Each structure stands twice: as structure tokens, then as C-alpha cells.
């Protein structure tokens, strides 16, 4: 498997205890608020260190490495753009040690591919939700990551923009040939994007497989979690 995580982390009364694997595909991690999904991504990215266990990427143990040496692109839920920097400088932030001409080429090429070349001189405050998401994606991808982590990347956009951005996320995976681990509580995102789906409840990965398979899961908690969201999915289709 391309990514393997077997690790534990305690934060106050919360305990993350994960055994997770994924290949070079698009994996969506589903779970309710408070399940530990964001902490899990931060552990993979190196922002949070495990108390025990390891993170392996393409066979190599990256647990001791700092975030900037892991080769992982990370888009946090709030996008974490620097408000005082232009779009250009936000995208270029991870290329501080790259020679200037090469840095400029990569920033402009990435902006062109994601349709934000006309925004390079703007500050984040002047961007729409969809534009901010594209800038955050560009910043994560410009470092040429081996893995892309997305934490609730569509939670701050309206439904129309969400549909467009879901198509763009699939384009990103194909265009850049990068495995993606996408965290959400939204079953529609999983249905539209995922090659595989994992379910996290109370800090543990409790099921993993194709989405259709998970609807017949024998785990009662998983069945309850998915059935409630499946009802919402059917209702949303009726309303559309």
C-alpha cells in the first residue's frame, strides 16, 4: 500500500487509535464531527506527532520527518491563506528554497492550470470561497507532493460551487497523478469522488471499502451513521 498509518495519539480525553492503508487512488474519509478526522490528517502531515506507532509513505517511515520534508500537500479546512500576502506569494510560500526563476515558473504554471492566473496580484480578502480553495490547492500542489490531504475542502462553498469544485478535484488527481485523502462528513462528496471510502468513529477506522459495500456493513454504528446520511442524500436529490 502507498500509505500506511498505525499510530496512537491522546489529546486530553480524546484517543486516536488508527490502523489505515490506502493505495494511489482517491480515498474519502467519512465521519461525524469530533471523530478525529482532522487530527488524523495532521498526524499524517507531521503537524501532530503520534504517541506510538508510525506513518509510512511508499514504504518509507516518515514519522521522524518534519512536515516540510514529508512530500505531502495539505489543504486545511480554513485554507490557512496568509491575509497579508498576495495570491502569488501564498502559492510560492512552500518554494522558499527554490531558485527564483524556477519558483516563478512553477507558480505561474500552477495558477494557469487551476484557472487563477488572473488573481495572482490579489489578497485573499478579495477572493470568493471557490477562489480561495483553488489558491490553497495551488499552494499544496506546487511543491509537487507525493500525497495530497484535504480537510473538509468543500465545506465553505455553496452547492453550485461545490459541484464545480468536485469536478476540479478529480481533474487534479488525474492531471497531477497524486493520491488524495479527502476528509468530509458529506456523503455526496464520497459518492461523487471516492474510489474507496473509510469510516472513522470515535478515533478509529471502523470500515473501509467501496461506498456501496459499506451500506451493508455489519457494524451497527457504521450502518446507523451511513443510513442517516443516505436519507439526506436522497432528500437532496428530490429537492434538486
Swiss-Prot record:
Protein name: Molybdate/tungstate import ATP-binding protein WtpC
Disulfide bond positions: none
Group of enzyme by EC: translocase
InterPro entries xref list: AAA+_ATPase, ABC_SmlMolc_Importer, ABC_transporter-like_ATP-bd, ABC_transporter-like_CS, P-loop_NTPase
Assembly mode: The complex is composed of two ATP-binding proteins (WtpC), two transmembrane proteins (WtpB) and a solute-binding protein (WtpA).
Gene Ontology molecular function terms on file: ABC-type tungstate transporter activity; ATP binding; ATP hydrolysis activity
UniProt organism field: Archaeoglobus fulgidus (strain ATCC 49558 / DSM 4304 / JCM 9628 / NBRC 100126 / VC-16)
Subcellular location: Cell membrane
Name of the gene this protein is made from: wtpC
Signal peptide: none
Reaction it catalyzes: tungstate(in) + ATP + H2O = tungstate(out) + ADP + phosphate + H(+)
UniProt entry tagged with the keyword NAD: no
